[in-house]
Amino acid sequence: AYAKSLSFFFMKVSIVNIGNELLAGKTLNTNSHWIGGKVSSIGCKIESQITVKDEQNSIVSGLSYCLKNKPQYLLVTGGLGPTDDDLTRNVLFKFMKTESTFDYEYWKSLRSKYKQLDKKISDSVKSQALVPQIGEVIANPNGSARGLKFVKNDTIIFVLPGVPFEMKDMFLQSIEPHIIKNMKDPIFSKILRTTGITESFVYDSIRYWNHNKNKIGYYPSVYGVDIKVSNRN
């Protein structure tokens, strides 16, 4: 067995993925898998993770359900594009009870980018220049759909595009640093990997570690059993 990582474990995070194609199985939900792995690796606990339809009632229900658990962070992906079925932006504005303003400077920069690419910009793209009066926008270095940031009660809500490579860069540049900066009272964790022994044997061998000061997790696979030991000290 060997130790393979050291991390922190504290913040509660919930995830809402929005998209009919995700529910129908037409698109693999890689965003959920990637975000879950990332926030866990920096020391967060996934409180809940759900996928909802591109419909106002479904989105609101998903947000409300996750917020009941009072996570420190709620991460939302999908539905920020310019088409009619991209409802997330306007639904969030209503949910947060905020008006929006039109960012003429951003619209000007989008028109310039499209012109450089020799492409015609559609009026539908104007929706991506809307800015909440109560909230913030998050820069998107790889696309036109900027993210959003809100605070509801004690939960910080980040809304990101569903396009994986856009979402990942925005998470790494804006979301991850924010979470790490706000971490308090961290729990240290180590993962030990074993081979050639069963999960039941591992459990019987180390179950007395699992007292009030330690949290033990067992993760069996075809290669062996990983043991995650977490402790505040």
Predicted regions and their residues:
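Glycine-rich beta-strand-to-loop/alpha-helix junction loops that act as flexible
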Residues: 18-20, 76-84, 161, 232
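Proline/glycine-rich low-complexity loops and linkers
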Residues: 58-61, 86-182
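Accessory alpha-helical/coil subdomains and C-terminal extensions
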Residues: 151-232
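Glycine-rich phosphate/diphosphate-binding loop of Rossmann-like nucleotide-binding domains
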Residues: 12-50, 54
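Glycine-rich phosphate-binding loop
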Residues: 69-96
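Short acidic loop-to-helix transition motifs that present clustered carboxylates
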Residues: 51-59, 199
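Short, well-structured alpha-helical segments in soluble
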Residues: 61-69
